[in-house]
Amino acid sequence: MARLSEPSPYVEFDRTQWRALRMSTPLKLTEDELKKLRGLGEKLDLLEVEEVYLPLARLIHLQVAARQRLFAATSEFLGEPQQNPDRPVPFIIGVAGSVAVGKSTTARVLQALLARWGNHARVDLVTTDGFLYPNAELGRRNIMHRKGFPESYDRRALMRFVTAVKSGADYACAPVYSHLLYDIVPGEKQVIRHPDILILEGLNVLQTGPALMVSDLFDFSVYVDARLEDIEGWYISRFLTMRSTAFADPASHFHHYATLTDEQAVFAARDIWHSINRPNLIENILPTRPRATLVLRKDADHAINRLRLRKL
């Protein structure tokens, strides 16, 4: 652990220090399973899972148990019946970070690892993309160009959803977003029923405000971080690759990008980055980083080599 010259709410680790905290936590993920979890352009391997994600999964596992003891103590104080061990209060994890930084991969890997623990096997993952306003509503509000910014989300609906899950509702429904259509899928819902753990992944999940926010319901949060220049490079690289994958589908909203030359594609990607994604990152996403329980810092090669844990 890093020695800090002044008192700080954070503890900083390099990868060697962090991996020692894995203790004897077993790796129950195969290479084939990891391939299905890895995002486009990601270079995550089993070694990084062992050295970075297993210690993180162990930390969360310990915090889940501690949180349940805290809920039990509160119930005892209030004279309420002890909670049903088969229906514990769901543990909510937020995963935040920029477009193209790899937060979706982080969320999927955490889901896979945490679900392999017997006492919290029900782990659900929901992305906040489903809580974007439909394109028609964004157009009505004249904020289509601000898609992904905080005002483009139905934050009340998101708050109702997470509150329902946390409160033990029989089920809670999240809208479904299609990246192919670049819009909400009408009538389609993701139904969440009594999870032990809910992972909520999205750009703005750590946002604060004068009223109760979804981040106030988190028990743990992760911010995936990197240099702005590196994230821009990853975004452009992913855009180039998608010309022959997602964009190639005639049904894709972005099918018109599929035939761009490399030079044209780089120009288009850089324009989108500097007009939308970079401003959103600087104005709205990056300022929430200090609120995260854990910051995962990536180097230019995507490898996580530095971590910062909030201890207070």
Curated annotation (Swiss-Prot):
Top EC category: transferase
Pathway: Cofactor biosynthesis; coenzyme A biosynthesis; CoA from (R)-pantothenate: step 1/5
InterPro entries associated with the record: P-loop_NTPase, PanK, PRK/URK
Gene Ontology biological-process entries: coenzyme A biosynthetic process
Alphabetized UniProt keyword annotations: ATP-binding, Coenzyme A biosynthesis, Cytoplasm, Kinase, Nucleotide-binding, Transferase
Binding site for ATP: G97, S98, V99, A100, V101, G102, K103, S104
Subcellular locations according to the entry: Cytoplasm
GO molecular function terms noted in the UniProt entry: ATP binding; pantothenate kinase activity
Listed EC numbers: 2.7.1.33
A Pfam family it matches: PRK
Similarity-based family: Belongs to the prokaryotic pantothenate kinase family.
Gene name, Swiss-Prot/TrEMBL: coaA
CDD domains named in the record: PanK
Name of the protein described by the UniProt record: Pantothenate kinase
